[in-house]
From Swiss-Prot:
Coiled-coil annotated residue ranges, if any: none
InterPro entries per UniProt: Capsid_VP1_Polyomavir, dsDNA_vir_gr_I_capsid, Polyomavir_VP1_sf
Annotated function: Forms an icosahedral capsid with a T=7 symmetry and a 40 nm diameter. The capsid is composed of 72 pentamers linked to each other by disulfide bonds and associated with VP2 or VP3 proteins. Interacts with terminal alpha(2,3)-linked sialic acids on the cell surface to provide virion attachment to target cell. Once attached, the virion is internalized by caveolin-mediated endocytosis and traffics to the endoplasmic reticulum. Inside the endoplasmic reticulum, the protein folding machinery isomerizes VP1 interpentamer disulfide bonds, thereby triggering initial uncoating.
The organism of origin for this protein: Murine polyomavirus (strain A2)
Phosphothreonine modification, residue list: T357
Swiss-Prot/TrEMBL keywords: Capsid protein, Caveolin-mediated endocytosis of virus by host, Disulfide bond, Host nucleus, Host-virus interaction, Late protein, Phosphoprotein, T=7 icosahedral capsid protein, Viral attachment to host cell, Viral penetration into host cytoplasm, Virion, Virus endocytosis by host, Virus entry into host cell
Stated family: Belongs to the polyomaviruses coat protein VP1 family.
Gene Ontology CC: one annotated term: host cell nucleus
Chief place of localization: virion
Location in the cell: Virion; Host nucleus
Pfam (any one): Polyoma_coat
Protein name in the entry: Major capsid protein VP1
Comment, domains: A DNA-binding domain overlapping a bipartite nuclear localization signal is present in the N-terminal region of the protein and is required for efficient virus formation.
Length: 383
């Protein structure tokens, strides 16, 4: 009998005793800034860049331009004087304010009734403070150096420095917080906490008061010492900043055209430009200089340059036709101001809603209603 050939199966082979683990599924839809984010748009026109700059708003407006009638202070605040009481009213031209602007883009969607729309998404930004070399000017009519009475160089710009820049698809959300709530700011020319809340500031405004919030919707109107970026909001905006304090702190500033700041979040999605617009804002304070006669100090601000890269992205249409038609009809009606029919002071006594039909009840005095849980309740009349 011929010998049998051995099986070709190796005895060392081990079978998998259990199924191999599979990668956990991840969500494909992402809601960002109130939008359901979908895929990226590909093609030659799907990426664009925009360059812009913002000038500082230190208190002195751009006009008048005459260098003898106030124009010489453009880029500076006017003279800051020490308060004479706890209820000091600072002048508006001594308050550095936020710089902001909106850059508009061409319309991407001709048909707003589609299920999906295209939006610009901010991907990255290159930004730089311009003009730091001007701080080398030490021959101006400023405070003299402490080691030279009326000879040699003057004291350069020094003191507290504050740098913040932001970019996104919506105006920057701000949180109000002040050092002393007893300070009385002027009600015209600037936006204060009282402008928003319609009330005087309280002790909570020296910490975090949830009602003292605003949106940066005006250039040169929101004082830096009052309004700060709100970390609880700004979901569709990115902001970056740093602060260096001190009365004689030397200005420290780095600048380069090779540094890129990525605006994407942990999910790879950047700020979505709603309404075909990109909002930019910044504050760049380099310190202050003291005048020759020691009368006052002037804070110095610098402009900032932006170069933003944007790409197109598909999002689910957040504006259904029903809401568009409803808003159209509502806007056609005249706007009236009548007595309150909703809210705390409502004058509505009773509302009845009927659904379907039922037999006539035997006792018309029985009260029937639907509670907040959707259950039908019957209250029997008392004796």
């Amino acid at each position: 009998m011929a010998p049998k050939r051995k099986s070709g199966v190796s005895k060392c082979e081990t079978k998998c005793t259990k199924a191999c683990p599979r990668p956990a599924p991840v969500p494909k839809l992402l809601i960002k800034g109130g939008m359901e984010v979908l895929d990226l748009v590909t093609g030659p026109d799907s990426v664009t860049e925009i360059e812009a700059f913002l000038n500082p708003r230190m208190g002195q407006p751009p006009t008048p331009e005459s260098l003898t009638e106030g124009g010489q202070y453009y880029g500076w605040s006017r003279g800051i004087n020490l308060a004479t009481s706890d209820t000091w009213i600072p002048r508006n031209n001594t308050l550095p304010t936020w710089s902001m602007a909106k850059s508009s883009f061409p319309c991407l969607n001709e048909d707003l009734t589609c299920d999906t729309l295209q939006m610009w998404e901010a991907v990255s930004v290159k930004t730089e403070v311009v003009g730091s070399g001007s701080l080398l000017d030490v021959h101006g009519f400023n405070k003299t150096h402490r080691f030279s009475k009326h000879k040699g160089n003057s004291t350069p710009v020094e003191g507290s420095q504050y740098h913040v820049f932001a970019g996104g698809g919506e105006p920057l959300d701000l949180q109000g917080l002040v050092t002393d709530a007893r300070t009385k700011y002027k009600e015209e020319g600037v936006v204060t906490i009282k402008t928003i809340t319609k009330k005087d500031m309280v002790n909570k405004d020296q910490v975090l008061n949830p009602i003292s919030k605003a949106k940066l919707d005006k250039d040169g109107m929101y004082p830096v010492e009052i309004w700060h970026p709100d970390p609880a909001k700004n979901e569709n905006t990115r902001y970056f900043g740093n602060y260096t304090g001190g009365t004689t702190a030397p200005p420290v500033l780095q600048f380069t055209n090779t540094l890129t700041t990525v605006l994407l979040d942990e999910n790879g999605v950047g700020p979505l430009c709603k309404g075909e617009g990109l909002y930019l804002s910044c504050v760049d304070i380099m310190g202050w200089r003291v005048t020759r006669n020691y009368v006052s100090s002037l804070e110095k601000g610098f402009p900032r340059y932006f170069k933003i890269t944007l790409r197109k992205r598909w999002v689910k249409n957040p504006y259904p036709m029903a809401s568009l038609i409803s808003s159209l009809f509502n806007n056609m009606l005249p706007q009236v101001q009548g007595q309150p029919m909703e809210g705390e002071n409502t004058q509505v006594e009773e509302v009845r809603v009927y659904d379907g039909t039922e037999p006539v009840p035997g006792d018309p005095d029985m009260t029937r209603y639907v509670d907040r849980f959707g259950k039908t309740k019957t209250v029997f009349p008392g004796n």
